[in-house]
Amino acid sequence: MTTQRNDNLEQPGRSVIFDDGLSATDTPNETNVVETEVLIVGSGPAGSSAAMFLSTQGISNIMITKYRWTANTPRAHITNQRTMEILRDAGIEDQVLAEAVPHELMGDTVYCESMAGEEIGRRPTWGTRPDRRADYELASPAMPCDIPQTLLEPIMLKNATMRGTQTQFSTEYLSHTQDDKGVSVQVLNRLTGQEYTIRAKYLIGADGARSKVAADIGGSMNITFKADLSHWRPSALDPVLGLPPRIEYRWPRRWFDRMVRPWNEWLVVWGFDINQEPPKLNDDEAIQIVRNLVGIEDLDVEILGYSLWGNNDQYATHLQKGRVCCAGDAIHKHPPSHGLGSNTSIQDSYNLCWKLACVLKGQAGPELLETYSTERAPIAKQIVTRANGSSSEYKPIFDALGVTDATTNDEFVEKLALRKENSPEGARRRAALRAALDNKDYEFNAQGTEIGQFYDSSAVITDGQKRPAMTEDPMLHHQKSTFPGLRLPHAWLGDAKEKYSTHDIAEGTRFTIFTGITGQAWADAAVRVAERLGIDLKAVVIGEGQPVQDLYGDWLRQREVDEDGVILVRPDKHIGWRAQSMVADPETALFDVLSGCCIPSKPALRI
């Protein structure tokens, strides 16, 4: 992955102490100010990915975090197809897969009384069931994987820093002011106690700000531990439906045991009553909780840590104020159900950073940044609603088992056993349980939610057309289409020597047009339009005898335009515009689209 050096900074007063050819390291000047194009606050998934995307585009940036290092607990882990496509585009897919639990081991989600106890039911998850696996493989060049945040963050941070990001640990954001030229951010070096100012053209808040509304916060607790459980539960997630004895802190009858590393590092998640004081644990109590959960009294357990966190049901309706944009948990807070948190955070940054790059390179006016809120705020609402919906969908499982009102362990076990009876009531409970478990596909096999995102903004031109109606459940299934606003469909292209995806040749650093052999005039026009607008615009002509060929005919079946039509793909691989067939003046058509909508208010256009 290559990067471009960018020296487009205010030079007076700079005090450069080291320049490695990618990024110059400054000390505060005589006015105690350090300058950069973009300041990123926070090094989590949103922050570290934003730094990586910007540095890949050649945009100078500083990333600060008040902490000494990256995430110290596993936290997020499911990395869905859309995020893996983005990491593939950033050139780090192989690095991620080298550390991740691969897709084929993500396996089943098992519901059980305890991990070594009786199984209640299971569902194949994350596209591992054969029919759904085909859906996943046909939709994308990348498959989901399971990588803890403790391993993913350092990969993104390393690549960001190698490409030019200045990373400042133990540096705390204090406040900011902004004007029509930039943002002045007051920060604190927590090691020296020195306060200084970072002057940036734009500020990204990716520090996972907590909600101020106490009523929206619920308490949950994690215990991270090591134990060899390969004999009992070789699966990535095990909801434990029970009342393990001697556990004092519980949120009624639902626990989760999550695999961190196969099969000897795990994370226990359970709830406590937020009307009471938060629980205080020591290692001995934590070990006993783990043993009760697993159902093995003499299990050898090493406690790695425990931490509190909160559930929320919140999303922002506007993500930007002037030159300050927010991303990640700062704009959407929700339960971990469905694994949408870190995925959405990285996707926020992906959407924002190509727009920042266009503006900072002089290829677009600042109005383009307004489309960040227009496009991503509805996604924030969608994923918060879906995550909370997935969490609430556990109640029908308890209702089917008849244990919702159980108050003691004996009563719980007695009611749980009724599902096995040879009786009409037993049959009713079994049928209700199966229906409730099947409904969990909306959490664990919701490919449409994960990659079917649609953008409707001034950076998308539909020419008055309506989005095609879905023929299947839009949350469970992904429907491929080149309709503007949707994600570019995946198809395998190539030649006799190599094979690559449509996503691979529509790089995230430029706009791309796709056309066929009889659409060569579009490709010729693209060269002239790129020169007039001063942008990087790539033309791909697909067909027999061309450098790029439709190997299996998949692109022909998915493109939805004639061979002489054209599809404009934005740097984030969403369709910006399409024309069904050739027009009388392709250069004017392409110029008007790019200058008027996808890149609004270009300061100076070369006619």
From Swiss-Prot:
Keywords: Aromatic hydrocarbons catabolism, FAD, Flavoprotein, Monooxygenase, NADP, Oxidoreductase, Plasmid. GO terms for biological process: phenol-containing compound catabolic process. Its cofactor is FAD. GO terms for molecular function: FAD binding; phenol 2-monooxygenase activity. Residues 1-28 are annotated as: Disordered. Pathway: Aromatic compound metabolism; phenol degradation. It catalyses: phenol + NADPH + O2 + H(+) = catechol + NADP(+) + H2O. FAD binds at residues 37-66, 319-329. The keyword NADP applies. The keyword NADP applies. It comes from the Bacteria. InterPro entries: FAD-bd (IPR002938), FAD/NAD-bd_sf (IPR036188), RIFMO-like (IPR050641). Its EC number is 1.14.13.7. Pfam families: FAD_binding_3, Rng_hyd_C. Coiled coil: none annotated. Belongs to the PheA/TfdB FAD monooxygenase family. This is Phenol 2-monooxygenase. The lineage of its organism: Bacteria, Pseudomonadati, Pseudomonadota.
